[in-house]
Amino acid sequence: MSSLYAPTDEVKRRLRPFGLFFEKSLKDLIKGIRSQQSPEQLHEFLTRVLSECREEVKHADFNMKTNAVLKLTYLEMYGFDMSWANFHVLEVMSSTRFQQKRVGYLAASQSFYKDHDILMLATNLLRKDLKYSLSNETVRMGVALSGLSAMVTPELARDICEDLFLMLHSTKPYIRKKAVTALFKVFLQYPEGLRDNFEKFVDRLEDDDLSVVSATVSVICELSKHNPQPFIQLSPILYQMLIKVDNNWVIIRLLKLFTNLAQIEPKLRVKILPNVLELMDSTTAISVVYESINCIVKGNMLNSDDYDSAVACLDKLHDFCTSNDPNLRYLSCVLFYKIGKINTDFIANFDVLILRLLVDVDVSIRSKTLELLEGIVTEDNLVDFVQRLLKQFVDVDKICVNDQEFSIDIPEYYKSKMIHAICKITAMKNYANVTDFEWYIALLSDLCIVSQDLQDKTLAQKLGEQIRNIMVKVPDLRDRTLAQIVQLVKSEDITARLPGVLKECIWCLGEYSSLLDNKDEYILLLAENSKLYEPELQQTLIPAILKIYSNWCNESVVDTGRIKWVTERIITPLEDLIISKNFEVQERSSEALEFLRLCLDSLSEDASDSLPLLLTEVLPSFFNAFELQPITSGTQRKLQQSISVDCDTPFLTESELEQLLADDTSVDGIVSPDVSDTESDSEMYVPGAAPKDKGSSPTHELTTAELEAINERRKQERVGNPFYLDDADVGSVKKVDILDNLSNSKPSSSGSLVRLSSESKAKEKKKKVKVRVISDAVIVDGVNTADVTDDRPSNTPSARNKIALQLKNKLDSFDFTKPRDEGDYDPDVDLQKLREKFAQQRLLDESAAAEEEVVVVKKKKRSKDGSKSSKKKSRSKSKPSSKGGDTAEAELLPGLTTE
């Protein structure tokens, strides 16, 4: 009867040999986690389970210890550190039972890589488990090899490398295959092992078992991604395997391997390419065909003039793009893009296929197809492609599945990518594919409208740049473009949502303000709204107002009183901008404010009807000194590197300075204020010629012969210069009414702001005429625009949230030509360091225990009664602690040597 009242722990201990456990298993842990209702309850539950595992893992029973290690391994995935239990994991690894050993290796693969010291203790255990014997079955060796691959370090790889090479000669194909795959991680950490045992490893390519050959080819393929140089010598063997092997998996791995090798050895192309093309035609396996094309493209085997190989690849990809498998269609689009980058003529005839892919049910395929447009767009199909893309902003695509219709949701990132793609294909090659620029101007306006609801901030900048480029590069349509710009500036939605577009539009208004009729009203509009704009926009607004103000003041008929009133209206908002938080706005507003105040004082002092020189001569000289020319983005930054500034030579000598001060004539180089942007192209300042009749300086009348000579010389200078318009072109530029150009637009209440001076308002049906587009200027010979970097933000998504799975290895930078040095490594050094570390740790523990015992004895000496018993108690408490430590250490060491 006494057994009925035995302690609970004793009953559990007796029942465990029969397979009856009362501790919580991994299944109970998972059920408990799923039953928690809140994060707080889950955290409390996990903390309680972790404390239970800390007690269970110290138990002498290996079943309980294994169960605790298994639960700790699961909790490690929740972020709980289990490195404190590494010694207990090592004990479980040393168990003779396969189930317990497997749990130990699983836990070791998750925690041992953080602690190199414990791996040094586990080296002998690994070597013992890797040796085949009657007591050590094949599956046990497989578990050890799998665990080794997950926790290998440079030191462990060095110690275990020879044992793995011995396993390559095992009679069991399973062992040879597992050993080959384990060598992959070993070679990454210890490339000397590959260098010293290269022949032994390569011999597995001729193994009798196909699985071993497949594993060897796979390992070589993965190693070649890091350092392909040592495997080039294997090309003849691999080539013969590619011809003879029938296994598709091995063929795919061989093709991937040749892809890596051909990138550094161009001579392989001549030998490999014909066989790959033959394999691509003979096989029916889609995976092999795709990998063959990928090998040709990524292995640099396809030259830009090899049309036969390109056609063979593209025909196969065309069939893949019509497949029902969306994954195959996407991968085919990727290869289409890579082939198009080699030579765009290769994919020029696949416009029908690309049009079909642009409306694919899979949006990811549509997104990838957008990258193909650059290679197939011509002036004949540009409009079709753009219209197909614009319809996706308006129409709702539907798909029918099981007689049910589902609408295709177009994500925002794809809409942004469509707008970027439209801007790219229309502007490429200096707008060579655009035949109707009026259509293109209307297209940019539509894109501005559909971009208002998108969050991509780069769209506004991109569209604004396109509008600005049209104004600069297409002078024949500046009036039409300016009419569209006026509508965009008036739009409140553009002002609020697309400040990047508004910035470029305001710049165009200022730069080409001579085409505007009612300039004073534009000045007032921009000045009044200056407070509503962002600082980046205000930086452009201030000089734009001055440009419009300059052209307006120098018109033929302007009331002086009106000029004074408008000047005062400009000064008021500028006084508010000088206290802006943006330094650039402060500087520009201060400069403009001081100059306008001087102009206002000059207007007040001068009682005559003529304007002061500040308005007629000085202000126009700020902006009309040079003809604006388009240059490639980034050229100015590249140009600064080639300019040398001489800071030693004086700018003017004393005699030249005295002569300059004594000269009372007008300053050379000032452009007449009466000349507009287009008129300035046909009139040029001539030294010695009299300026306009604005001042009182003496004039010299030129004879007819002199004028003809000057005109002839000017024509000769402008021959071949694309940045000057011919006289016929200048005369053909008409200033038409913007309201007439925008006849299809809705009438606005502020229609007076959009009038242009018109010479003829007759409406005629316009024909599509190829207009002249100004090319980018070459500022300095020798500046390579290909080397110019662009610092503007890219619309490529950032990769900061991606998980970096690339592990550190020594194979990438290892030099296989370096001979082996026998004195590189002394195996006793690391062992001696470990012994010294443990000895130092033991001394620290003993000193801490001794100090604690002395303190207790001193305290107990003060009391006379019970001093001996107290000393005995203190010593009895201190001694078991040391014995317990020795016992734990003694228990660990036998566990490491248990058979």
UniProtKB/Swiss-Prot annotation:
Q: Which organism is it from?
A: Eremothecium gossypii (strain ATCC 10895 / CBS 109.51 / FGSC 9923 / NRRL Y-1056)
Subunit structure as annotated in this protein's UniProt entry? Adaptor protein complex 3 (AP-3) is a heterotetramer composed of 2 large adaptins (APL5 and APL6), a medium adaptin (APM3) and a small adaptin (APS3).
Q: Where are the HEAT repeats?
A: 37-74, 155-192, 194-229, 231-267, 268-305, 308-344, 345-382, 384-428, 480-518, 536-580, 590-613, 614-656
Q: Which InterPro entries match?
A: AP3_complex_dsu, ARM-like, ARM-type_fold, Clathrin/coatomer_adapt-like_N
Transmembrane ranges? none
Residue ranges annotated as compositionally biased, kind Basic residues, are 857-880
Stated name of the protein:
AP-3 complex subunit delta
Give the superkingdom in one word: Eukaryota
The record's comment on protein family reads: Belongs to the adaptor complexes large subunit family.
Protein role: Part of the AP-3 complex, an adaptor-related complex which is not clathrin-associated. The complex is associated with the Golgi region as well as more peripheral structures. It facilitates the budding of vesicles from the Golgi membrane and may be directly involved in trafficking to the vacuole.
Q: Give start-end ranges for the coiled-coil region(s).
A: 841-862
Biological process annotations from GO: Golgi to vacuole transport; protein targeting to vacuole
Location of the protein in the cell = Golgi apparatus; Cytoplasmic vesicle, Clathrin-coated vesicle membrane
- Keyword entries, A-Z: Coiled coil, Cytoplasmic vesicle, Golgi apparatus, Membrane, Protein transport, Repeat, Transport
Region: Disordered; residue ranges are 668-701, 741-768, 782-801, 849-899
Q: What is its main location?
A: Golgi
Q: Name one matching Pfam family.
A: Adaptin_N
Q: How does the entry describe its membrane topology? A: Peripheral membrane protein
Q: Where is the composition biased (Low complexity)?
A: 743-759
